[in-house]
Amino acid sequence: MMIWQCKMRDWLILAFLAAACFCTIVRGQVAPPTRLRYNVISHDSIQISWKAPRGKFGGYKLLVAPASGGKTNQMNLQNTATKAIIQGLLPEQNYTVQLIAYYKDKESKPAQGQFRIKDLEKRKDPTKPKVKVVDKGNGSKPTSPEEVKFFCETPAIADIVILVDGSWSIGRFNFRLVRNFLENLVTAFNVGSEKTRIGLAQYSGDPRIEWHLNAFNTKDEVIDAVRSLPYKGGNTLTGLALNFIFENSFKPEAGSRSGVSKIGILITDGKSQDDIIPPSRNLRESGVELFAIGVKNADLSELQEIASEPDSTHVYNVAEFDLMHTVVESLTRTVCSRVEEQDKEIKASALATIGPPTELITSEVTARSFMVNWTQSPGKVEKYRVVYYPTRGGKPEEVVVDGSVSSTVLKNLMSSTEYQIAVFAVSAHTASEGLRGAETTLALPMASDLELYDVTENSMRVRWDAVPGATGYLILYAPLTEGLAGDEKEMKIGETHTDIELSGLFPNTEYTVTVYAMFGEEASDPATGQETTLPLTPPRNLRISNVGSNSARLTWDPASGKISGYRIVYTSADGTEINEVEVDPITTFPLKGLTPLTEYSIAIFSIYEEGQSLPLVGEFTTEEVPAQQYLEIDEVKTDSFRVTWHPLSAEEGQHKLMWIPVYGGKTQEVDLKEEQDSYVIEGLDPGTEYEVSLLAVLDDGSESEVVTAVGTTLDDFWTEAPTAIEPTSPVTSVLQTGIRNLVVDDETATSLRVSWDISDSNVEQFRVTYLKAQGDPMEEVVGTVMVPGVQNSLLLKALLPDTEYKVTVTPVYTVGEGVSVSAPGKTLPSSGPQNLRVSEEWYNRVRITWDPPSGPVKGYRIVYKPVSVPGQTLETFVGADINTIVMTNLLSGMDYNVKIFASQASGFSDALTGLVQTLFLGVTDLQANQVEMTSLCARWQIHRHATAYRIVLESLQDTQAQESTVGGGVNRHCFYGLQPDSEYKISVYTKLQELEGPSVSIMQKTQSLPTEPPTFPPTIPPAKEVCKAAKADLVFMVDGSWSIGDDNFNKIINFLYSTVGALDKIGADGTQVAMVQFTDDPRTEFKLDSYKTKETLLDAIRHISYKGGNTKTGKAIKHVRDTLFTSDSGTRRGIPKVIVVITDGRSQDDVNKISREMQADGFNIFAIGVADADYSELVQIGSKPSSRHVFFVDDFDAFKKIEDELITFVCETASATCPMVHKDGVDLAGFKMMEMFGLVEKDFSAVEGVSMEPGTFNLFPCYQIHKDALVSQPTKYLHPEGLPSDYTMSFLFRILPDTPQEPFALWEILNKNSEPLVGIILDNGGKTLTYFNYDYTGDFQTVTFEGPDIRKMFYGSFHKLHVVVSKTLAKVVVDCKEVGQKAINASANITSDGVEVLGRMVRSRGPNGNSAPFQLQMFDIVCSTSWASKDRCCELPGLRDEESCPDLPRSCSCSETNEVALGPAGPPGGPGLRGPKGQQGEQGPKGPEGPRGETGPAGPQGPPGPQGPSGLSIQGMPGMPGDKGDKGDAGLPGPQGVPGGVGSPGRDGSPGQRGFPGKDGSSGPPGPPGPIGIPGAPGVPGITGSMGPQGALGPPGVPGAKGERGERGDLQSQAMVRAVARQVCEQLIQSHMARYTAILNQIPSQSSSIRTIQGPPGEPGRPGSPGTPGEQGPPGTPGFPGNAGVPGTPGERGLTGVKGEKGNPGIGTQGPRGPPGPAGPSGESRPGSPGPPGSPGPRGPPGHLGVPGPQGPSGQPGYCDPSSCSAYGVGVSHPDQPEFTPVQDEQEAMDLWSAGI
């Protein structure tokens, strides 16, 4: 019954209940469930079912408890549930069950019952029962599995990660069975967040996490996730998936717990397509116990490799998916048992306490690190945890090391900081107490030996010694001048730079420069220096003209540089006049208003934007103003007289006339016109003597000298004679004095004040006279001054300093003079400048400073002159406010006397004198060495500031001189071509920018001539300029055949002598030279490392003797390659290899092949032909272009004509940063990096961590760089001269599935500290490409490229990458398509003291870091930025253009008819000169007495066609026999014919080239045919298997197991699909793909896709790029028929046949034809990769008739891989491409083929 709880106010619901319910329903109750039933389904599980109650209810509460008492477990169920499974029960125990329905807060009466599980094995303590809910009807949850047999009741918990194979081979139906299996698996465990956790990952081509361990909290949630697990689809890359869960699932962030058992369960149905051993080993070693469950096609041996031991309990394998349920109970029991055992082990180890380590010791303390050592703890320690933090506070850091380690280095610390340290011993579940201590780091090291040099007007350089460990440097620099002190600048640079330029400085300014070494964000103590910039350039060549009495004209030459004008300062010599004017940028200027007869000093300054220059100085004296030569007084009267003079010229000005009574009075004056010559002075006093003065006043205000005359007016009593004499009274004479208290005081150096008291008011005037007291008493008066009678003081001026004067004052009355009064006075001594100081000494300047005098000054005059050498006395003037000056243009290392005068009102003061000295700009320790008869060398100690040296060699016999200039860093120079026994003077001048110091000289005499003259001229040819930087391994090959003769051979030797003499440095640091003389057999005259000096080398050349014989040039070239260019003979890595061949005739052996090989290997060959030499042969021998490498002279006397050009070309080749290499048929400048890293067939086996694999087309070799191979080479071997400024890096590479997601450097150059300098970084996780380097300023720069074209490089296919670097940009070209370019600065060159590395992980540190695995097929550096635009990507199948690309090696073409296409007929072979190149054929028979003929045309019977993959023969029509023709190009594959008749016998071939090594395939007899495998995505051709024993042709086998479904490939056009199918794959589809029909017919017409025969699917990419090799499947149906070849066992992609014997073409007659080889066994259904050439088999099918030619030997079988005929393309994955479904039978495929698909 249902009881409903209703609210009283809810009348609508009450009404509904009243109408719908039985009358027995009681309001407020919920009806209980009924019909409770029990069903035991396993030994610990029971199913409970019931009938739902009537009415409305919200859900159920199910309570289960042991009847004997114990914990009651309650579960809430949904209202749709009608069943529940209770798990984890114990047998032989009664349980009570209560089931209650509830609605909101009301519950029904419980439906109750009891049950007991009998006859089951005894169990452990009861645990919480688990309930499995089963919905009724159409509930949202599916029903549970019918049977649950086991439940893990252990209290131990675990972290279980299940890894599920979701590849295409499983199928959607089978994947449902996998879900059921997973549900049973999860059900068996007690799952919860605090119990056992279960995570799951699904994988195919790429793994993904479906849910982490901590994703769900209950078992129900986990089961729900299992039921909704999506099917992924893809490839089977189990190794990648195992590594994925190792890196992502068993981590704390993913829910993994410490101290908890870790279980990994793998479920897969096939063999992995990648390596599973390393990732499974990593998981096991990390403590994960692995279980492997294989289904259907799983590889048991692989499962055993993955799982933990023992295999009997950890490996499960079932035949079909519907049998997986049979292993659930066994698996869960084993896992449960192992979890319990591990839990005990974990707890036991946790109980064992660990004592702390002891004896903490710190050592090796630096500023950023120190080492911590301790004594190990007793007991089993898994690891040590070292915790450290700054004492003053900071975040604790820690380092964890292995338990076997007892020390570690703490890095990246702060300098000068105390750190607290604690070391803990850690076991699996416990840790010890900490061992504690402290240590203080040192201060950061600072820069040392700071030096400022190369100083200019606005720049200087600063350098210092590098600081170990510094991450960079901070440079601060600022002027010391007071007004500029705030203009401080800073510069940050990288740690590799210790020499930089500071620019933008002020001229003539002292700067302080401070350098800090930076360690991250920390800075060291500063290193500081001071230096003064040079002054600006002054004007030149001052000329002074038109000097007059008051004017002059200045003219000068302009200053260099951009100026804004000039400042002119002119000063009188006495310092009383200082004038200044600024003018525009003119070169002449008039000076006016000068004082006549005055000496002037001139200073002209250039005015720049930065300031003004030093002055250009000069001096001159103005002329005297003409004085008046005549002045006369007449017409004298009592009150007037006339003054007469000669008038001035009109242009000089006017006259000034002045007069004054001689005995005192007022001076009067009058200005008169210049033409006036007399004037009457009136108003004079009678009987008075007057002084009259006349001077000329010039127009500019200056005055001439004064002309003076004295005249006396008549007394008035003389006007007329008295008529009578009147008597007079007697007169008494009285001496009068009107002066008292005469005082002389207020003394200065040039003045005295005289004062007195007036005692008589009748005094008319006072006469003051003064004279020197020390002089003769009769000495004339120095001066007389008349003052009025009312004045009682006077200031006497212009006196001499420090002089005693006698001053006399006399009163003057009307009637005469009174009594004079005298007093002494003395002037003070003059005060001049004091305390001369010298600073800023430099090579051509010095600064002087002085203290000014106490008194006022007008300026200063500085006079200086060299002491020890005759020279002009120099002087300059400065203003009164200046007390320092820089004396410039001085001589280096010279003493100067300096005098400084102060200009004062009275003249110049006494001189302040001193001695100053400039620095010496000159070398030291100059000495001669290596003195020979005709040469000598000088060496010296380098001057620290020198920018260059000028070396002069003077002969004392004939005064001839040689002069050279070398750089400032050079300390040695040699002179050649000197006279023996002659005295020479060697002078070295040191230069600093434009400044040159004095010479330092020594005398040296060359050695005397030997007693007997040498056979050859003794003069060693001087090195040519073009050869100064030459560095090469140079071999001369000299023809010594009979046709040369003794005389001509000596001419060759003389030519070699001159040529070698042009080289500069001989030996390991320069050019090494070897010599070979060749005839029938080559003879090595000396090896590359035989001589270390030019003298000994030339002497050896002189003594080469003539050999005689025949001309075997080819043999000699091979001898040079194999014998001389070896490490034993001194050849060096990374150095250009140059050969010079000299011959006079045609070679009697083949030169073409060996020459081509050596050119392709990077040798630079010069060929010189004389007389009868064959020019076409010379062209074959010489490198390209022939215009630079091939020379021809008419006779042996004409070598001089080519000598200079040959030397130039050879030295340019030897000096080039980029050597010439042979690439794609042309010679160009660059580096063949594959050879330099040893990644070539002959060398790769010696490189650790590298294997050779098939590359593109399955024909080119590529090299797999395995994980942590860290392939490297020293930079000095690869790029000894660094990288050019512009270059292109070309790579052909492939990213592998196990290439890590972290960034790694595809290639990079490291310095000696393992710091990257330049390189390319690929980020597999971020799908980006980054190029980095240091620019010319020392700054680190990076540019990153991304986008679709970049991302596709990471999808697992081969891609061609060009990175173009120029001075302005970096450009990236992918698969011959430009994808982007970015601006960069010009690159700095690299250091050669580091290494170059392939694949280095970016996070790696130090020389032993990690590297990423990838495949590399090609790597070149071309010294050009245009190479990328010329490349046609011929190595990539999808981009290859057959018309423009060269033929593939050992390849077959794909044509529409599959028939051999004949090329055009070549000319018939025979004796004669070599003709034009014909079709690639065998050499014709040897002609009589002549050189080898050219290859002939193809014969009617073609050679055996290229070898196809091994398979069952499909008989064709018999071929007709014919004569053997020359070897032609490999023809297109035709249908297999029946064996033809026996052809003419041919020669045995030489051994063929070995094929690529591959994985071992399981060999065995061919099995019966099975169903064809499902087509896979286009992938890399598989690796060639090892050669197996010859097997007989087996019968068709029974159908084999179905292969895995491949990834979807890229879309191709319908036209391409049909064309490729018709042309190539007709017979393949007819014989092997008969089962493809029904599904393929469902493919839309416009989105068809080509799939190759089953191969390992690659990452989404363009279809043509190869994927990783697939494992060998079971034997399949007959493969595509190939021509009869040598038998081989079926292996990966077609095993190679027995190695054939193919040799170099001989010149003898053709040998007999070899017997046909045995037939090959049938192969598997997949096309094989090309194997090595087999020996000649039976005659192949008939080809097209060719032009009859001579019988040729059997051709070398080639390879024809049908997969290479598939439509390769470049592309990315297409998510919208329709999914392929496996073809079920052959009829479907036949139907599809007939439909034209």
Curated annotation (Swiss-Prot):
Organism encoding this protein: Mus musculus
All residue ranges annotated as the VWFA domain in the record: 159-331, 1033-1206
PTM remark: Lysines at the third position of the tripeptide repeating unit (G-X-Y) are hydroxylated in all cases and bind carbohydrates.
Region (Triple-helical region 1 (COL2)): 1460-1611
Function: Plays an adhesive role by integrating collagen bundles. It is probably associated with the surface of interstitial collagen fibrils via COL1. The COL2 domain may then serve as a rigid arm which sticks out from the fibril and protrudes the large N-terminal globular domain into the extracellular space, where it might interact with other matrix molecules or cell surface receptors.
Cited Pfam families: Collagen, fn3, VWA
Domain of life: Eukaryota
Compositional bias of kind Gly residues: 1537-1546
Transmembrane segments: none
Primary location recorded for the protein, binned into one broad class: secreted
Listed SMART domains: FN3, TSPN, VWA
Region (Nonhelical region (NC4)): 1218-1459
Protein name in UniProt: Collagen alpha-1(XIV) chain
InterPro entries per record: Collagen, ConA-like_dom_sf, ECM_Assembly_Org, FN3_dom, FN3_sf, Ig-like_fold, TSPN-like_N, VWF_A
